[in-house]
Amino acid sequence: IPANNGLLLQQQEFLQFLRQQCTANGTLLIFDEVISGFRVGFEGAAGLYHISPDIITYGKIIGGGMPVGAYGASAAIMANISPEGPVYQAGTLSGNPVAMGAGIAQLTELLKPGFYEELESKTTAFVSAIQQYAESRNYQFKIFQVGSIFWFAFTGQEHIRRADEIDGDSMNVFKTFHRELLNRGVYLGPSGYEVSFVSSAHTEADMEKAKLAI
């Protein structure tokens, strides 16, 4: 799920095509789930779309707020990493206990029954209310959403799957939108290309305040 240049939701068939072509041509399929990992489900986008990548990368959420990154792959691929294999990978802060402890605590929370269902329901209710209001005013406005990730797009387009489909002029509208929300006590990322997230820490009061401000 490309989510660092807008939220570009891909079709299931396209992702399956990538998997098939990589397999047929002996190419590794890598899923970057630094943003989508653990946000759209405990198995990330790979689980959501039922696609098995050869290599997968994670970050952000797995550290519970602490800086951390991780990657995983099949046993055959991971056998290439030292000391078993020739590829050296290490770092001063690799596996540092503070980040690992925070990450374990975070993942324990995510595994609680109903966690993702409640989070997605909260996000969907928030997004739907804003979208319905925009449509009632005939605004050129669309909120793209998957799981707890959403993206405000000032466009009438129903689908945006590639970065070059984003109207760059709409970013001028976002600048005003961002400034007005700041004045009302709601902070979004400073770029119109950035996605936003709902977390379990957001209360109903938080969501209502943001909704009314928007």
Task: Please provide the spans of the model-predicted regions.
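Conserved N-terminal phosphate-binding loop of PLP-dependent enzymes in the Aspartate aminotransferase
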Residues: 1-214
